[in-house]
Amino acid sequence: MTKQMHAFHMVNPSPWPLTGAASAFMLTSGLAMWFHKHSNTLIFLSMILMLLTMYQWWRDITREGTFQGHHTSLVQKSLRYGMILFIVSEVCFFFGFFWTFYHSSLSPSPDLGMMWPPKGVIPLDPFEIPLLNTAILLGSGVSVTWAHHSLMEKTHKDMVISLSITIILGIYFTLLQGMEYFNSTFNISDNAYGSTFFVATGFHGGHVIIGTLFLTVCLLRQLMFHFTSSHHFGFEAAAWYWHFVDVVWLFLFISIYWWGS
């Protein structure tokens, strides 16, 4: 057995990055096929592979950080920098959607009737489901902050309650978003308004689902007493991600739902 003379974690070979990349490739290919009226079987297969990858990868990271002690203070610092860079990349990702929306709306082309929303498009009322969803996400931001304070104050019960509330609000938001899509009078292939609306809000909805899964894993780990007030990066990363999702939604609500309508 060799003695490690540094504080870094030398990660063992893992198949999960490969299976995760394969599931992402299958998902994008499946979506392209579905958009062209082909079978959606590949989408379901990719989702199954992605969920399996997430489960196995989370399991391995939990083992390494909680039971094997590989997540030293230096490793946690590096993970925090990594999460910050990931969120910055997500900001750039959504910036492209907002750029597309404002490019189309501030100078509508003749194809759109020189007006915004384009002629024939009945936009959604921003003060119905969108406003309710805004209140839900803001409330979930408060509850996840409550969970963080409960963890720092070592009140296990309060953290479980507040984290459960956050997850329920995330699921409720997703259900309302689906209902909004189902009842909309336009679709993704109608014009620039439909495509920018569904792509921007759809990707945000996907991030909400991922964040809800992230927080659910944190809840299960908290029930097994994995987190302490000084060793809880998994939850910290989930909370950062959730706050990012909240902020993106505020920009979506103001730009696309309110100003864009």
From Swiss-Prot:
Q: Which domain of life is it from?
A: Eukaryota
Give the stretches traversing the membrane.
16-34, 41-66, 73-105, 129-152, 156-183, 191-223, 233-256
Hey, which stretches end up on the Mitochondrial matrix side?
1-15, 67-72, 153-155, 224-232
Q: Which family does it belong to?
A: Belongs to the cytochrome c oxidase subunit 3 family.
List the subcellular locations.
Mitochondrion inner membrane
GO MF annotations in UniProt: cytochrome-c oxidase activity
Q: What InterPro entries has UniProt attached to this entry?
A: Cyt_c/ubiquinol_Oxase_su3, Cyt_c_oxase_su3_dom, Cyt_c_oxidase-like_su3, Cyt_c_oxidase_su3-like_sf, Cyt_c_oxidase_su3_a-hlx
Outline what the protein does: Component of the cytochrome c oxidase, the last enzyme in the mitochondrial electron transport chain which drives oxidative phosphorylation. The respiratory chain contains 3 multisubunit complexes succinate dehydrogenase (complex II, CII), ubiquinol-cytochrome c oxidoreductase (cytochrome b-c1 complex, complex III, CIII) and cytochrome c oxidase (complex IV, CIV), that cooperate to transfer electrons derived from NADH and succinate to molecular oxygen, creating an electrochemical gradient over the inner membrane that drives transmembrane transport and the ATP synthase.
Q: Which UniProt keywords apply?
A: Membrane, Mitochondrion, Mitochondrion inner membrane, Translocase, Transmembrane, Transmembrane helix
Q: Could you tell me which PROSITE patterns the record lists for this protein?
A: COX3
Q: Give the E.C. number(s).
A: 7.1.1.9
Source organism of this protein record: Myxine glutinosa
Q: How does it sit in the membrane?
A: Multi-pass membrane protein
Lineage at the top is:
Eukaryota, Metazoa, Chordata, Craniata, Vertebrata
This protein's assembly is summarised as: Component of the cytochrome c oxidase (complex IV, CIV), a multisubunit enzyme composed of 14 subunits. The complex is composed of a catalytic core of 3 subunits MT-CO1, MT-CO2 and MT-CO3, encoded in the mitochondrial DNA, and 11 supernumerary subunits COX4I, COX5A, COX5B, COX6A, COX6B, COX6C, COX7A, COX7B, COX7C, COX8 and NDUFA4, which are encoded in the nuclear genome.
Pfam families listed in its UniProt record = COX3
Q: What is this protein called?
A: Cytochrome c oxidase subunit 3
EC main group: translocase
Keyword presence, Signal: no
Instruction: State a GO cellular component annotated for this protein.
Output: mitochondrial inner membrane
Which GO annotations describe the biological process of this protein?
A: mitochondrial electron transport, cytochrome c to oxygen
